[in-house]
């Protein structure tokens, strides 16, 4: 079965299901569909190079206990998706299944809103806000599907728009500390914060490095946060 959850967002599914003990359920998540109506993960797994068949992406598995209606919410993960493909290794009917989307993002209060007489502009605004929240998980990320990394240029380019709409000052203040932690003895900072050091800092260049100056300056400009400026000054100097 393929379920359309109605909106492309970030979070996890909440599955209610009943079936025979030992039945293995697999949930695969995607942002797109193929022409035949099946899910399309090609925009997500294009760079995936698995070393074994269990290295899968955007996928959850659950084995039924066979004790009436069971509830499964995947722990320790989140996905970006609109569509969910449900498969099982034993017969099920759609009447046995209930799926919900539990949307997730950092807890930030709304502080701004926009509405006008042009519905197209209103829709674009809502899409942008949804995309912003879908990429706010303790740090601003590049996507909720594949890398989920704190790419520094991606993050600061949407910072102003985000702060006009949400009180995300704590997210950015924490992110600046992550940037400081990536700095090397020669002053270089990584293009991703926090970083696993998969790439060294020499490739990033000024567009990514600029985040260590721009993010705290926006925090000061829009919230008066002088403490983050004090913390980052030795690294930025």
What do these predicted ranges mean?
Residues 148-155, 181-193, 198-216, 229:
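Aromatic-lined, polymer-binding surfaces characteristic
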Residues 233-236:
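C-terminal PAP-associated
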Residues 118-125, 165, 202-206:
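Short acidic-aromatic active-site loops that bind/stabilize oxyanions
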Residues 1-146, 154, 170-173, 189-197, ...:
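Extracellular/oxidizing-compartment recognition motifs
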Residues 5, 74, 148, 162-165, ...:
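Short, charged/polar micro-motifs that form catalytic or ligand-binding hotspots
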Residues 157-168, 211-228:
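Well-ordered alpha-helical scaffold segments within catalytic/enzyme domains
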Residues 130, 134, 164-185, 212:
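Glycine-rich, acidic and aromatic/proline-enriched surface loops and short helix-turn segments
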């Amino acid at each position: 079965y393929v379920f359309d959850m109605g909106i492309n967002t970030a979070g996890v599914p909440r599955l209610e299901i009943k079936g025979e003990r030992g039945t293995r359920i697999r949930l695969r998540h995607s942002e797109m569909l193929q022409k035949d109506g099946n899910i399309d993960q090609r925009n997500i797994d294009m760079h995936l190079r698995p070393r074994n068949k269990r290295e899968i992406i955007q996928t959850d598995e659950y084995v039924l206990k066979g004790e009436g209606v069971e509830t499964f919410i995947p722990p320790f993960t989140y996905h970006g998706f609109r569509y969910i493909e449900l498969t099982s290794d034993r017969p099920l009917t759609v009447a046995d299944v209930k799926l919900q989307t539990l949307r997730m993002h950092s807890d930030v209060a709304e502080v701004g809103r926009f509405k006008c007489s042009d519905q197209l502009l209103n829709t674009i605004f809502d899409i942008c806000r949804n995309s912003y929240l879908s990429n706010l998980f303790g740090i601003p990320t590049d996507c909720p599907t594949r890398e989920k990394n704190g790419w520094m240029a991606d993050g600061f380019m949407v910072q102003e728009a985000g702060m006009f709409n949400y009180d995300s000052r704590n997210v950015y203040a924490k992110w600046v500390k992550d940037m400081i932690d990536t700095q090397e003895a020669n002053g270089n900072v990584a293009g991703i914060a926090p970083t696993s050091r998969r790439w060294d800092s020499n490739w990033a260049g000024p567009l990514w490095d600029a985040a260590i100056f721009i993010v705290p300056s926006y925090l000061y400009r829009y919230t008066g946060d002088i403490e983050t400026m004090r913390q980052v000054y030795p690294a930025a100097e």
